[in-house]
Amino acid sequence: GDFNCWNQTDHPLTHIGDGVWELYLEGENALWDGCKVKTVVDSNLIRTEHIPLYIRRAVQDSRTNIFCGEVVDERSTFRWTDANFVATDDIFIYEAHIGMCLEEGRIASYREFADQILPHIKDSGYTTIQLMAIMEHPYYGSFGYQVSNFYAASSRFGTPDDLKYLVNKAHEMGLAVLLDLVHSHAVKNTADGINLFDGTT
């Protein structure tokens, strides 16, 4: 990754059992917010690059269209203000796709959805929103049903803090939030998915 100028052999991981591998990097700033990273898997079959399985953010290079893992500083300064939110027992669900919520014919953002669409949903009497396509997925046309990174919110709609902003605002308006995640539709891609991550199909 960025931390070692993308040298694939400088930082080998150590196998600690049960399919778990680890790497210890010295220094508080060995990895930083926005640092791009990948994992190289050298198996009997082939050497492949992958986005780390537990990455919290994956971003797409605008020139190559290739996805890469990006380190997220977990010490986010986002300030939640929804402590008093209590979900209602009267569930009335509005299903929505963040990217397709605007009329302009472009991909919308988490913040645009929060500021422009949530008031309409609330005014229409809904109590819950169900968001499609939240987990990272390389093929936009899949509506998020070809997930590549199960722990990363889709970066094409904004940052993790932008998604927190949306959820926080929904809760402030009394709306519960459900994330539509389908585990049975993982993408078959190797570079940005979980296929061949352990060296097998």
Please identify what each model-predicted range represents:
Residues 1-3:
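Extended low-complexity, serine/threonine- and proline-enriched intrinsically disordered segments
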Residues 5-95, 100-105:
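The feature marks proteins involved in alpha-glucan
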Residues 59, 81-88, 97-201:
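Substrate-binding/active-site clefts of carbohydrate-active enzymes
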